[in-house]
Amino acid sequence: MKAIFAGSFDPPTFGHLDLVLRARSLFAEVHVLVAVNVQKRYLLSECERVDLMRQVLGDRPGVYVFPWRSLVVTYARDVGARVLVRGVRNATDFCQEFDLAWVHRALDAGLETVFLAAKPCYAALRSSMVREVASFGGDVSTFVPRVVARLLQEKFTQA
């Protein structure tokens, strides 16, 4: 069975990677969609985010990374995926993700959403927090893979 894990990944964190790997243990294929949310301003370009996800996930069997600029339900229909995987860190996340699951279900009644609870060590980890720490020159290596930390350092050194 194919599952989709979509996010902006700006930047990808160890929490994101953990969710992808856990989803892969449950599903034959996990399609990671690096999405564009028109309501967000990004630090990293779409190409950088896709490239970073591909680098940190490597050539793991059954894990595929693609950029996506449309509705997730459209991609699901295109590839025959019936499951969306969403990570939740806390009750606030759950409420937001539950609302999103309702929208997905309204658009495609056959699409299920599976919620994976974040591991406790990732429960407070947010990409926005990583960006803020990096913007002040802080060490983000405990939150993101080395390649991501290097790119963030470059971005904020140039700014």
UniProtKB/Swiss-Prot annotation:
Species of provenance: Treponema pallidum (strain Nichols)
Q: List the residues marked with site Transition state stabilizer.
A: 16
Q: Where does ATP bind?
A: 8-9, 16, 87-89, 97, 122-128
Superkingdom, taxonomy of origin: Bacteria
Q: Which SUPFAM superfamilies match?
A: Nucleotidylyl transferase
Q: Which gene encodes it?
A: coaD
Subcellular location, record wording: Cytoplasm
| GO biological process, any | coenzyme A biosynthetic process
State which Enzyme Commission number(s) the record gives.
2.7.7.3
What protein name does the entry list? Phosphopantetheine adenylyltransferase
Cite the annotated pathway. Answer: Cofactor biosynthesis; coenzyme A biosynthesis; CoA from (R)-pantothenate: step 4/5
The cofactor(s) it depends on are: Mg(2+)
Question: Which GO molecular function terms does the record list?
Answer: ATP binding; pantetheine-phosphate adenylyltransferase activity
- Keyword annotations of the record: ATP-binding, Coenzyme A biosynthesis, Cytoplasm, Magnesium, Nucleotide-binding, Nucleotidyltransferase, Transferase
The record's InterPro entries line, in alphabetical order, gives: Cyt_trans-like (IPR004821), PPAT (IPR001980), Rossmann-like_a/b/a_fold (IPR014729)
